[in-house]
Amino acid sequence: MSKKNERKKIISLVKERASFLFSTNEISITKAAKKACKELDVEFDDNMRRTISRHLKINGITNNVSEADIEETDVFKEAKNKEIDKSKKRFIFSWCQSETEIHDGFLTNIEEYAKHIDASIHIIAGRYKNPTSIQSNKNTKAKEKNLTNSWHPRVVPYLDANRHKIHENLCLLSDVKIQPTASTPLSGLNGMTGLESCIVGHPRVHLKSLPILDGYPHKLLLSTGSVSVENYTDTKSGKKGEFHHTLGFVIVEIDGDDFHIRQVQCEDDGSFYDLKYFVSDGEIMLHSGVEAIVFGDLHLGETNEDVMNTSFELSNYLKCNDIILHDVFNGHSISHHERNQPFQLLKREQDKTDSLFTELTEMLQFFDTNSEYNFVMVRSNHDEFLDRWLNDVDWRKANNKTEYLRLANLLIEDKDGKGIIPKFLSVTKNDNVICLGIDESYRIKEWECGMHGHIGSNGSRGGVIQFKNLNTKNITGHTHTPCREDGHCSVGTLTHLRVGYNKGASSWMNSNFVIYPNGKGHHVHIINNKFTTL
């Protein structure tokens, strides 16, 4: 053996002996180092003391393991080399903070669910930069902690700090460390993965659909949720992080050239719903039905019939009869946007889409055809097209004169002020429809579902920041773009993804939102007329 290798072996023995002495005799690092050197007949100096001190930190024997030391552990090095099982078609991704307890029941349920659906589990290795983290500040003796690595032992087999290409159009960015207190974990990631959607590890559950050019694959950014419990400082940023901390995971199903992706959250006891399944105490069951589904904006006349039919298939699959609707009426026959466009008006005249009677009849037929469902129709901006038309135009010079006079008489009788569409539906006796007014609340479990999204605070234009800052969780429509940011979610659309006026790059997606009996919920995207492989 060379002198160099012999020296390494001796130093390794000194480090192990010093670790044992420090852990069992409650002596200082310096005393443990001196004693180990004396026993093994090795010269003690300050370099040796620092070497042993670093060894104790890296192996979690001393408190306040630094971020750099954590990343030198064998556990993290293995996580950096983690590989994806290419034979799997389903994956579950979550996140875990170092030096932090996990929710045992939740992880057990994830493991059992993964076995049931044949999924591979990956848990992204999270690190909290703040050294005053409550967990590491506990007055616990080093020997009592007796840590051999910096993550909970149960997550170590799944720990991931590598970057993976899950699918031709989907990446997992386990190598991107985002502070758990970051309020917008998806910011700055838009161009990082090119054409590919990407998943990042973070205890907040956020979702963004990015604008793409026509013909390109949809691009989503998602964060995972956590399997570790809250562990934050008592600072403002720490308390905000604690409030938004969510136990959850992302599930991915590979479906040939496509993939399906959902963000699942659990209850306090670790139980969770995912589509038709309810998982609790390690058991996988078929549940009796979901609470409600919020459909993407409908816009009859521009609706993609295949997507709408698939959405009703989703309702039947989830045993759901209660459906929230946005922008049922489109208003293309009387749109103020086209009032001064003579050639567009001529085109509508030629293809018979300028008939208000036909458009109203299609709406009635929609509710009659789907009479087995209970609908709640949220007051939307396209509903207001018709009220605006009645107020603005001179009926003597306009098309649709007969419908104008008929609806004008109804509007005069509108005592509750909800507008002409609700009044029209009440007269035609559609008993399976509840029509909301513009400021009328409609709550389902924890969610406010009575806002369309076109009006924000104090009459301003609605937006994500306004809605996520409201004092209640809420689901809106209007943007045709699925989004999730803290307590705010918006649905996509059930229309064709190109309808003429959304020129340029578009973030529109065919996407609905499911609300489960426990009050949790997530988006279900319709991809090529499918929503799952389960």
Segments (PLM) and residue ranges:
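Extended recognition/assembly regions associated with phosphoester-bond processing machinery
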Residues: 3-4, 8-9, 31, 35, ...
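Short, amphipathic alpha-helical "recognition" segments used to contact nucleic acids or chromatin
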Residues: 6-27
